[in-house]
Amino acid sequence: MEKGLSSDLIIAFVAIVLHVVNYNVTAQFEYKTRYFTKLIGRNAIYYYAVFLIISALIRDHFINVAVLSDKDSIILFPTEIANMIGDSCFIFGILLNIWTLKALGIKGMYNGDSFGHIMDSPVTGGPYQFFSDPQYVGTTIAALGVAIRNQSIYGFLCTILVGVVFYISATFVETPHLKNIYSNRSYSKINFKNLKSLKN
């Protein structure tokens, strides 16, 4: 039980939750205030994308710290098999995320809807033929790969939390927010040729 209260695991859990809270809160804040667009201009979404990538890397760092502190705590496979399965899952997850980025573009992948970049229609091609939220599936599978490769109980616990937090976020926060955005297109879509109008 004491092992389950490891500070490394707790920090990883906090990082997982805070990353999702971070992008939900900042996206809704921008949508309601246009603060970042007023401050930075039409390229605000690209700075925001970098911000979210850094946030995700910080989360991943703390997950890796927890996993490495717990390496080989649950031996499910011989090392060679664990490496092969883990690496395969990790690569698949990363490739799925790259495929999602290709399908959505930077604006679609990183909450561009909240920044006034409204899509004409939902994306149904690419990975969306198979998953409703492929970027979350990809990240979860990549985390699973890390857990398997290191045969770490902490890794599996982090993977479960990643999946659960993504599911809760997508179902109860992001979907209602997107419905609100697209039901009010006149407000949601920004005329980037006339950003001065946002200050009125």
From Swiss-Prot:
Pathway, per record: Phospholipid metabolism; phosphatidylcholine biosynthesis
Enzyme Commission number(s) of this protein: 2.1.1.17, 2.1.1.71
Reactions catalysed, as given in the entry: a 1,2-diacyl-sn-glycero-3-phospho-N-methylethanolamine + S-adenosyl-L-methionine = a 1,2-diacyl-sn-glycero-3-phospho-N,N-dimethylethanolamine + S-adenosyl-L-homocysteine + H(+); a 1,2-diacyl-sn-glycero-3-phospho-N,N-dimethylethanolamine + S-adenosyl-L-methionine = a 1,2-diacyl-sn-glycero-3-phosphocholine + S-adenosyl-L-homocysteine + H(+); a 1,2-diacyl-sn-glycero-3-phosphoethanolamine + S-adenosyl-L-methionine = a 1,2-diacyl-sn-glycero-3-phospho-N-methylethanolamine + S-adenosyl-L-homocysteine + H(+)
Entry's Gene Ontology BP terms: methylation; phosphatidylcholine biosynthetic process
Lumenal topological domain: 1-8, 30-39, 108-150
Intramembrane region spans per record: 9-29
InterPro entries given in the database record: PEMT/MFAP, Phopholipid_MeTrfase
Localisation: Endoplasmic reticulum membrane; Mitochondrion membrane
Keyword Transmembrane: yes
Pfam families: PEMT
Signal peptide limits: none
Keyword Membrane: yes
GO molecular function, one term: phosphatidylethanolamine N-methyltransferase activity
Binding site for S-adenosyl-L-methionine: I91, F92, G93, E174, T175
Function: Catalyzes the three sequential steps of the methylation pathway of phosphatidylcholine biosynthesis, the SAM-dependent methylation of phosphatidylethanolamine (PE) to phosphatidylmonomethylethanolamine (PMME), PMME to phosphatidyldimethylethanolamine (PDME), and PDME to phosphatidylcholine (PC).
The protein's name: Phosphatidylethanolamine N-methyltransferase B
